[in-house]
């Protein structure tokens, strides 16, 4: 999720340049987004997890995160899960596609290419959104947590139990298996961990541009990036954002 901040700065640069207005409807830049009552959602709601699009309730193929068009088309068609602006809900993975599609619509570049050109290269950051082949040897595997996997495996067993009889974690486990729920749509659609709990070590995951979750880089690069933001938005003559934007 550290990648979310890097993705957000890409779109904020376009705001700073006057190419995007935070109070304009998203649909002004992304017309298909207006479906299902979303025509008035302002750009600023995408930044602060208030758009009501924390997940997709239509079941998605397991490899949907590796196909940008599938994800953004699903989000464009999705009905908000609450009235936009009235509630906050963590957009665990969709955050990156919402921000990233705005960047693509306005700049004409994928967010990975935009980030590399406008931020990573100027600051000499060893960080990527969508890992190139020649960087694979620098990446170490991660060890997955099996708790999320077990909750998903157990979820079908809870289908026969009325939800009102379950509390706390047990109710959450039941929701995980149902993409029509907020928890299920946000964290288990597509069902990647069922297919492969080691998916984050796969070639497909590393090469994909998933701006909310799969940036690859060094701790030094992350520290440098956020250090620039915390010290006014400029370093060594490289301008990232104005202080007022930060």
List the model feature ranges, each with a label:
Residues 2, 16-54, 58, 77, ...:
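Active-site helix/loop module of the DD-peptidase/beta-lactamase fold
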Residues 2-3, 7, 91, 95, ...:
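Hydrophobic (often cysteine-bearing) scaffold residues that line and stabilize catalytic clefts
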Residues 12-17, 97-105, 224-231:
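Short glycine/serine- and small hydrophobic-enriched flexible loop segments
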Residues 32-40, 87-92, 215:
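A glycine-rich, coil/turn loop motif that links secondary-structure elements
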Residues 44-48, 73, 224-227:
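Generic alpha-helical structural context detector
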Residues 58, 73, 86-104:
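Internal, well-ordered domain-core segments that constitute the primary functional module
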Residues 78-85, 95-97, 202-211:
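Flexible glycine/proline-enriched surface loops and loop-helix/loop-strand junctions
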Residues 133-246:
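Penicillin-binding protein/beta-lactamase superfamily catalytic region
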């Amino acid at each position: 999720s550290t990648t979310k901040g890097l993705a957000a700065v890409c779109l904020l640069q376009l705001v700073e340049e006057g190419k995007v207005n935070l109070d304009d409807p998203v649909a002004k830049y992304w017309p298909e987004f207006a479906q299902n009552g979303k025509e008035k959602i302002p750009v600023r709601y995408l930044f602060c997890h208030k758009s009501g699009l924390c997940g997709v309730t239509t079941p998605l193929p397991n490899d949907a995160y590796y196909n940008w068009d599938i994800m953004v088309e699903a989000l464009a068609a999705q009905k908000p899960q609450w009235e936009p602006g009235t509630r906050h809900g963590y957009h665990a993975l969709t955050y990156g596609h919402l921000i990233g599609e705005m960047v693509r619509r306005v700049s004409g570049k994928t967010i990975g290419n935009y980030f590399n050109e406008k931020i990573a290269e100027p600051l000499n950051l060893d960080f990527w959104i969508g890992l190139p082949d020649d960087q694979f040897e620098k990446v170490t595997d991660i060890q997955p947590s099996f708790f999320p996997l077990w909750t998903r495996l157990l979820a079908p067993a809870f289908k026969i139990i009325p939800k009102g009889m379950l509390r706390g974690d047990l109710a959450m486990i039941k929701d995980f298996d149902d993409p029509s729920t907020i928890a299920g749509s946000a964290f288990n659609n597509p069902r990647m961990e069922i297919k492969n709990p080691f998916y984050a070590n796969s070639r497909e995951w590393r090469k994909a541009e998933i701006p909310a979750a799969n940036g690859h880089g060094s701790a030094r690069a992350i520290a440098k990036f956020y250090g620039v933001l915390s010290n006014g938005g400029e370093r060594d003559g490289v301008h990232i954002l104005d202080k007022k934007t930060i």
